[in-house]
A protein has these predicted regions:
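General beta-strand structural signal in soluble alpha/beta enzymes
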Residues: 25, 83-85, 109-110, 141-144, ...
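C-terminal and late-domain segments of enzyme folds
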Residues: 2-49, 61-76, 156-157, 161-295
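Glycine/threonine-rich flexible loop motifs
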Residues: 115-125
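Catalytic-core regions built around general acid/base machinery
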Residues: 100-101, 124-138
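Portal/gating segments that form or line small-molecule/metal binding sites
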Residues: 54, 60-104, 110, 117
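Catalytic nucleophile loop
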Residues: 110-112, 131, 135-155
Length: 295
């Protein structure tokens, strides 16, 4: 199984060095009726009109209804083939037929629902390995809402909204490890989740916190990501934290965090995951980056 690996930098920071396929991480409630900007980009990355999309409905309790919605959307956008696949047991996730579904797809998409269902049913199975292998050979992996949260190595399971950073306001669990070194939260601005994301990053200061608004996506390619959609992405960086009272306060007591960084990045901006720096014009940066690669 191919897993992303850590690269240690000067100053003790750690960066992401992931598999080669792009990750399309959506904050939920993506546009499905209008321009469908995010889903259209996912499909483009997955092969456009030659795309064979596998929609994973494992997170939802309504796999037929949710799955058919995405089948209709991706077919409307021009996909060559769209299949849904629901996993109801770990035994099913280890079958040869399940692995073949993954191998045959040119791109894989996880719907929303409950992120714990994804890790409980897929973590450590042959499907888990097959999806990581698909990423390694460059196939895109997308996920929305719960399908976004599960992508990190440490994921937010649930927690309080509209709260200041405190001990006990967020519950964490191991994720699927498609993106190391990050903690992801979704429906971010709409549900007032800054407090719980900061609380999570305070407990894991070596991780970046990525808070993704609705109808907004982070598209990770290598060590960089770009932002696409109507909202913004909030990046919480505790790497330069100078003081925390985490070890001296109890449950529900307020956290003191000094030196923490917050970046707010709308459509057209990006982020360097290695340097932990914002990219203020993605298209300009990408053009210059490509020129450097061809020298």
């Amino acid at each position: 199984m191919c897993r992303p690996t850590w690269t240690r930098l000067r100053g003790g920071k750690r960066s992401v060095q992931g598999d080669s396929g792009p990750l399309i991480i959506i904050g939920g409630a993506e546009d499905k009726q209008g321009e469908c900007k995010i889903l259209r980009e996912f499909l483009r990355l997955g092969g456009g009109r030659e795309a064979r999309v596998l929609v994973m409905t494992v997170a939802t309790e309504l796999p037929i209804e949710v799955g058919m919605d995405y089948v209709e959307i991706f077919k409307h956008l021009g996909a060559k083939d769209v299949r849904t696949f629901d996993v109801s047991s770990r035994d099913a996730a280890n079958r040869d037929s399940a692995v073949e579904f993954v191998r045959d797809a040119t791109c894989i998409f996880f719907t929303g629902g409950d992120q714990l269902r994804i890790t409980k049913l897929l973590g450590g199975t042959r499907i888990d390995a097959a999806i990581h292998d698909a990423l390694r050979v460059g196939k895109p992996l997308g996920g929305t809402s719960a399908g976004a949260s599960m992508m990190s190595s440490t994921m937010i399971v649930d927690g309080e909204s509209e709260t200041n950073p405190r001990i006990g306001v967020v519950n964490m669990a191991p994720g699927m490890e498609f993106l190391e070194g990050a903690v992801i939260d979704q429906h971010f601005a709409q549900r007032g989740r800054l407090g719980r994301l900061v609380s999570a990053v305070a407990q894991y200061p070596h991780h970046l916190g990525l808070g993704i608004d609705e109808d907004t996506a982070v598209i990770v390619e290598g060590r960089h990501f770009r932002v696409l959609g109507k909202g913004a992405v909030s990046v919480v960086d505790a790497g330069a934290l100078t003081h925390s009272n985490l070890d001296s306060v109890g449950t529900n007591e307020s956290l003191a965090l000094c030196g923490i960084k917050l970046h707010i990045l709308p459509d057209g901006y990006g982020f360097d995951l290695r340097a932990r720096m914002a990219i203020t014009d993605w298209n300009e940066w990408k053009g210059n980056h490509n020129k450097e690669l061809t020298k």
